[in-house]
Amino acid sequence: EMSASLVGSEMCIRDRYSTPKQYIADYKVNATLEKERYKDGIFGLDVTVGGPADGVASVSYTLNDPLGRPVLSGEMPVKSRGLSNFITFGEQRLKDVKRWSAEHPNLYTLVLELKNAGGQVTEVTGCEVGFRTSEIKDGRFCINGVPVLVKGTNRHEHSQLGRTVSKELMEQDIRLMKLYNINTVRNSHYPTDPYWYRLCDRYGLYMIDEANIESHGMGYGPASLAKDSTWLTAHMDRTHRMYERSKNHPAIVIWSLGNEAGNGINFERTYDWLKSVEKSRPVQYERAEQNYNTDIYCRMYRSVDEIKAYLAQKDIYRPFILCEYVHAMGNSVGGLKEYWDVFENNPMAQGGCVWDWVDQSFREIDSNGRWYWSYGGDYGPKGIPSFGNFCCNGLVSADRVPHPHLLEVKKIYQNIKCTLINKNNLTVRVKNWFDFSNLNEYILHWQVVGDNDKLLAEGNKEVNCAPHATADVTLGKVALPANVREGYLNLSWTRKEALPMVGTDWEVAYDQFVLPGTKGSTAYLPAKAGQTAFTVDKETGALNSLTLDGQELLATPVTLSLFRPATDNDNRDRNGAYPVSYTHLRAHETSAHL
């Protein structure tokens, strides 16, 4: 049902703990920003104290800044009102707060204390706090008032133990995502291990948290569980649990009602409930399409043309963010650039989440002692139906080795993009796609290399360029030697100072441009081999003539003609309902140079 390996395992470790008779049962942190300048923080706190009263107890809190210095505090008595007491600390304003974002995940620390009538501390709890806003503003998805592009992936929990993922493996996941320019993760299709949320808070990943609801086996028509109110309690219970469990995590910027479960009264009610309790995050649901119960149009696997058709509609007010796209199965992700040409040039098209992060396969040993990756069909009696390798559609292998197409994701998702606008003096136009980072946090390394692999020039530059701005950088004229037909300008960017997940030696972005050498004659270059003669176009490298004993053998110049075998995505319909046909395929783009 969830496009994941259907294996059993211990899903999580259960923590057991005891509390005093009177205890802190729940708390909700409200850490947002004022919406005039998005500079000052607004802090509020709601606390629920459970259990029978023990005299006049009190609840106090301290909020410490990222350096550990207290910046806010408060204390209120717990009035005896039965077995549950609700306490609200009034909102307070913090000037020029350190804001949280995926680029700069600044965290404050909240410490909550419950004291008995004698002033003795009986319980201490708390969490990390991030000041940020997440909203739909003028039809665009914004963090801290700034429109952002979702450079995302979907992530199932998978390891060689099944669905149980160790802390070390989660740390490896987030490190790889940060290294490969991913800024968003969708928890597909269920809330995940609590440690994953803490990692995303601390190291900076936007998170789409998703309720554990999927029933696409029932279809989207009249039989859909979404339309049967008998199932409302089940839908509502899973939505409640998702929200209450994770409501205090700043990394969660969008709630998702579920996945591929149809749409109807049950999802309308869960949407209504979430909007009633949640004022600081949008809510999305893919199967709602353009019905009222979604704040984001998040249809999966829409083509570039379908995105353009949506944007051409009148009076649209939802951003288009694909919850799944460019199915990363086998040799794949080749169409990513075409999507991002649209996202970078249309304000209300704001990215999406690749399906998906990790291959759900298992390492096995064959009869010859050699290891291999197993998948559906490798287990159980022969003839048992399976989905084959359909769950091997990750950007990384099951042991977290990056697949080649993760490099394509890194390149397209990179936040620094350059255009060569003057080949004579090597002037480069730099676009800063970061939302909250100046490019002076990075170093530009450049070099000019000839087609003989000799280094002709190199240097480093610091570029001052604000988020979403452009800057023109002139590197200087580099003369190519006469024996060099063409040179290559290589641009590479690294961090000036290391981040916890990204070192100063890691290339975060690169570009390459061809520099023409001295233009030679366009006359044909003749050559002979015995009684055979041929001519080659010096500009294009095309074979224009081939003669044998003076007789021309070519009717036309030879042109490149290539085709590829079918990929996993070409053949991925596992029921054979849509046989692959190649008769419609044509060359997308051709070019030639020598």
Each predicted region: which residue ranges?
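Secreted/periplasmic carbohydrate-active enzymes, especially glycoside hydrolases
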Residues: 5-10, 15-199, 203-207, 238, ...
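Substrate-binding/catalytic cleft of secreted carbohydrate-active enzymes
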Residues: 171-177, 184-397
